[in-house]
A protein has these predicted regions:
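Pocket-lining segment of extracytoplasmic ligand-binding domains
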Residues: 82, 155-249
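Structural motif detector for alpha-helix initiation sites
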Residues: 118-119, 206, 303
Length: 317
């Protein structure tokens, strides 16, 4: 299914037996509504309308999507603008081509009665996160936290339910549902409200972009069409996602969808004109500067090599 063309210059992308061009999308987690637009484009035939046969490969906590794309195991992947910039700084030849979320749904979840009322209050507490998370370093620096501890995330609410002082990293569209279903009263604090707000993006390899810009354009166009459709007509797509990931209930998927829609994570609500799929050079530069300040990017480079505005709705800005 995957040709070696993506690793070398000057060769054509091969068509499958059905006459469609096969490509793979590596997601960042197991099938869920946060991927709804991609499944919409696949199920409703929008990829096929563009001549593409798209395989959606589920991710998980230990999948390195940047590496998958760099070595040609996938042509496209989901990620975030901060991770793309860090990967490019580390020599990974990847390029972001469109945004799938204008706002980042990462948050901290706390019990309703927690004494932690703001990010400044995290001092003296432990926080369960994916160890090494850059946003956590940003919080420590911005709020001058001296005594906050990282503990490994378990990707479950079990520890949260047992410990009234527990604080954990979450997607605000996911874990609060499970905690409330189990009887907890919870609060959340969005990381994006601190000023650290990466896009969620689609990225590809620099080689694939250079060799197959027409395929990239088709994939972006069909994916954004799927996202527009999913935000209006989610039910049958959620039913299909539920078959792929039976751990998700109808109620949980509805909770996730409503969060994505009502909090404008996908389409954005920026008065300056943020819209589905778009990103701006100014915001990429701002994120790059934050990473430089945190010293997670050690050797400066032009952040413009990490993204392209070529495929964005109305050209981006």
């Amino acid at each position: 299914m995957l040709g070696i063309c993506i690793m070398t210059g000057g060769c054509r992308r091969q068509h499958g037996a059905n006459g469609l061009t096969p490509v793979t999308l590596q997601t960042d987690w197991y099938p869920q509504p946060e991927h709804g637009g991609f499944y919409d484009a696949q199920i409703r035939g929008y990829y096929k309308d563009e001549g593409l046969d798209v395989t959606i490969r589920p991710g998980g906590p230990y999948v390195n999507a940047e590496q998958q794309v760099s070595v040609g195991e996938a042509q496209f992947a989901m990620g975030s603008s901060d991770r793309v910039l860090q990967a490019v700084g580390n020599g990974e030849p990847i390029v972001a081509v469109a945004a799938t979320m204008q706002r980042d749904p990462q948050a901290l979840m706390l019990h309703q009665d927690s004494p932690v009322k703001s990010f400044q209050d995290l001092d003296g507490h432990a926080v369960a996160i994916k160890l090494g998370a850059t946003w956590f370093s940003y919080l420590v620096q911005r709020y001058h936290l001296k005594n906050v501890r990282e503990i490994p995330a378990t990707y479950s609410v079990a520890n949260f339910m047992q410990d009234p002082g527990y604080i954990q990293q979450i997607f605000v569209t996911s874990e609060p549902f499970f905690a409330r279903q189990a009887g907890a009263r919870v609060r959340t604090m969005l990381i994006s409200e601190t000023g650290y707000n990466p896009y969620r993006v689609i990225f590809t390899s620099r080689a694939f972009l250079q060799q197959h810009p027409e395929i990239v354009a088709k994939f972006v166009r069909a994916s954004l069409r799927g996202w527009r459709d999913y935000l209006i007509h989610p039910d049958d797509i959620n039913a299909a996602i539920g078959k792929l990931n039976p751990a998700l209930s109808v109620a949980q998927m509805q909770f996730s969808y409503q969060g994505l829609r009502d909090q404008h994570f996908i389409a954005g609500d920026d008065p300056s004109g943020a819209e589905l799929g778009q990103f701006t050079a100014a915001r990429w530069t701002s994120m790059y500067q934050q990473l430089l300040d945190l010293k997670v990017i050690e050797k400066p480079f032009d952040p413009a090599i990490a993204y392209t505005l070529q495929f964005l709705p109305k050209g981006g800005s």
